[in-house]
Amino acid sequence: METTGQAQEIIVRQPLLEDLVDTFLKDQDIAGSSRSTYSRSLLKYLSWLRETSRSERLSSLQRDDILAYKDYLLTQKLSSYTVSLYITAIRKLYQWLESKKIYPDITRGVKGTKKPKGYRKDSLTPDQLREALRKIDRRSQEGLRDYALFNLMARTGLRDVEVSRTLVGDIRSEAGQAVLWIQGKGKDTKDDFVLLTKEAMRPLKIYLRTRGRLSEEAPLFSSNSDRNNGEGMTTRSISRIIKTALIRAGMDDKRLTAHSLRHTAITLSIVGGASLQQAQAMARHSDPRTTLVYFHNLDRISAGAEKCIDF
């Protein structure tokens, strides 16, 4: 590694920068999924440096270069959330580089994009939920699995990553109520749960019976593919199953995704009379203000001032 005298510059050649990114990722105390997200984000940044010949002058990169990368991202038809995610990964990298006295933080003052207010995905109506479930063919084990999966997510607000981590033994009884213990987003342990109502449990029991005798360590939802038969399902597979069910029910809308079932569960719980505390507990929001967004959106619709206009 060469330095250039008084300046804090370090002439970093591309292989070395990639090595630094690898070291940065290993040094982060974050969940594996977050590490993968950072990795993808930073690989895109490294690729852009090569494409714009900036990899040839890594030692002299400045804040303007980061702003140029941000402008590039904004031309790629990416969502504001994705752009902010990419910028956050770069900020974390340069903050780490500065803390290690390797390179100054040239991202200081660079902001992500402005995120839209409210929640990001549309929610479904009860009629739409019933139609999507009706379209799932339950004549096979795979169909029973998909039905139980869709139904569970719509009734509990589980995230796809939370579903992917669940095991058969995570179904337990608390005070006489069936619950499913889960490892939440960004958590290292299964320290929270969702209630399993009779409506949530019934399809789940039917599906589990088709799999025969299962150990407590068996995945709650298992893959039926030749390559991963019997293994736990990935978040990608879960998302695909939900999306397929929605499309078959005539809801081919990019705004409707597996995460829409989470928004749907929270919204329907509030419509059904859940308090802020109850909805927050089910959604496992650390900040009640996140849950309040759902209340505000529903109030805005039901009590909109536009309805008072008459001429």
In which residue ranges do the predicted regions lie?
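Conserved catalytic core of the tyrosine transesterase superfamily
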Residues: 1-311
